[in-house]
């Protein structure tokens, strides 16, 4: 059984027991989170596709940890001008473990 849900402007395909990183959610570690923007639920041969959402569809997950991703370096370089600008960015994330999928 798997589902596709929307969170943080992105779509994620998940199954029970899977862990994944989402955009930072404002919840505590160990808390349970419910995602109700479910776009598709598949259970073997049965596939429920929403238009745009599956009615009664829900994905529940447990928050494992919060953290920051790897550093992304941004470089702006002006040729022949002896000018260079460097910056870095580390995006916050929330790691969740999928505990249930309901259709």
Swiss-Prot record:
Carries keyword Transit peptide?
A: no
Q: Which SUPFAM superfamilies match?
A: L21p-like
Any one GO MF annotation of this record: rRNA binding
Gene Ontology BP terms? translation
Q: Which GO terms describe its cellular component?
A: cytoplasm; ribonucleoprotein complex; ribosome
User: What do we know about how this protein assembles, alone or with others?
Assistant: Part of the 50S ribosomal subunit. Contacts protein L20.
The UniProt function text for this chain reads: This protein binds to 23S rRNA in the presence of protein L20.
Full protein name? Large ribosomal subunit protein bL21
Which organism is this protein's natural source? Vibrio atlanticus (strain LGP32)
């Amino acid at each position: 059984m798997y589902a596709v849900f929307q969170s943080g402007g992105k779509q994620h395909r998940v199954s029970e027991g899977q862990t994944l990183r989402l955009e930072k959610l404002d919840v505590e570690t160990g808390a349970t989170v419910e995602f109700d923007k479910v776009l598709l639920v598949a259970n073997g041969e049965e596939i429920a596709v929403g238009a745009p959402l599956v009615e009664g569809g829900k994905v529940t997950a447990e928050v494992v940890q919060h953290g920051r991703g790897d550093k992304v370096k941004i470089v702006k370089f002006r040729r022949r001008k002896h000018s260079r600008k460097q910056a870095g960015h580390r995006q916050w994330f929330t790691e969740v473990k999928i505990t249930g999928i309901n259709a």
